[in-house]
Amino acid sequence: MQHNKLREVRGTKDLLDDELYKFQYIQHLAQTIASRYGFIPVDTPIIEFTEVFTKLGNTSDIVTKEMYNFKDKAGEDITLRPEFTSAIVRLLISKNLTIPVKLFSSGPVFRYERPQKCRQRQFHQINFEFFGSDSPIADVEMISLCYNILSELKLSDRIKLEINFLGDQETINSYKIHLVEYLNKYQKDLSEDSQRRLVVNPLRILDSKSPEDCKILLNAPSISDFYNQNSQNFFKEVLDGLDNLSINYVINHNIVRGLDYYCKTVFEFTTSELGSQNSVIAGGRYDGLVKSMGGHSTPAIGFAAGVERLSALIDYEHKKPKRIVLIPIGDDAISYAIKLAYELRCKGIHVCWNNYRGTSLKNELRKANDTDIVLIFGDEELQSNTVKVKDMKTGDQQNVAVCDLLDNLLYRIV
């Protein structure tokens, strides 16, 4: 293989040591909190039939521009999952799960985007879906779960909750008419993407980051002016619930989310510390998605958080266990080291022994200079059933009887 192929594919990233530990910490914390809220962990394949994701909406950027699609050897249209929700809905329907049910998942997702800071083509998400409740209390619970995660990560004071309410279908239909009427007056001044969306999905223009679009949107009609009584009551209950939990929020009527299936409550937790990639957690209601994919009519709400973005914001130092290095001297000692290493590891002690041939004691000690404890034994120690235990931080060294070795090491590593 050519050398220039021995590298990461553009938009992907290797994870090593401390960075991987940080990722695992975030994912483990999320699953722990999910369990407190009654979520069941599930896992779906990273590949699905393409039609699973076309329900995201033919006007969404994910479907039209960003999906990794291919035909397998059987001629089936396959897609690397670009998000979790549709795959989880597929699981819900195909496994005929009983609702209400709360499902937690995590792992890599794939989108063909322009790579930049905290925006890769393969990235990782933690994902929460709640199926079976149309109550605004469910929305409050899910948002509080987000806030719980951010608080545990010590980010709650650096993140802002932005929330919007898209209303029911009656509200959306009425608002679309007036929004299109307003935007048509500025059609030629809109960005190219927004000119296309004006025809196929005008609500998505509200989410535009284009400077020319933002200027036009300043005087656009607000969806809140078109709420019917049901929408007003629902949104008020959500906001009252957040107030009751002392969760601060900002109402932002331009939040519509990038996927076509969202309705009613939509929200984002944003930060000013990641440049243009300011959304850390995002989600909302999708009461019509399950039915549109062939299931029963099922109200639902969910959200996903970007692990890379959370990782970029938090300080985390993996507490590494104290390392014990074996330095056997001579063939008999090496034979004993095999047994000793196995027995210590079975007792939960971290043993590092990589040089099975051995060199000089001086050389081995030099290589072990950054470790915690060294065990030295040769013919003399084997005959007396002892091991030299050296603390590499203090330089202290003592002979320890083999029968006392485990207790001695456990005392040192606590």
UniProtKB/Swiss-Prot annotation:
Record EC number: 6.1.1.21
Keywords: Aminoacyl-tRNA synthetase, ATP-binding, Cytoplasm, Ligase, Nucleotide-binding, Protein biosynthesis
Chief location bin: cytoplasm
InterPro entries in the record: aa-tRNA-synth_II (IPR006195), aa-tRNA-synth_II/BPL/LPL (IPR045864), Anticodon-bd (IPR004154), Anticodon-bd_dom_sf (IPR036621), His-tRNA-ligase (IPR015807), HisRS-like_core (IPR041715), HisRS/HisZ (IPR004516)
Catalytic activity: tRNA(His) + L-histidine + ATP = L-histidyl-tRNA(His) + AMP + diphosphate + H(+)
One Gene Ontology term from the biological process aspect of the record: histidyl-tRNA aminoacylation
Localization in the cell: Cytoplasm
GO cellular component, one term: cytoplasm
Statement: the UniProt record of this protein carries the keyword tRNA processing: no
GO MF term list: ATP binding; histidine-tRNA ligase activity
Quaternary structure note: Homodimer.
Cross-referenced NCBIfam families: hisS (TIGR00442)
Recorded family membership: Belongs to the class-II aminoacyl-tRNA synthetase family.
UniProt protein name: Histidine--tRNA ligase
Species whose genome carries this gene: Ehrlichia ruminantium (strain Welgevonden)
Gene name of the encoded protein: hisS
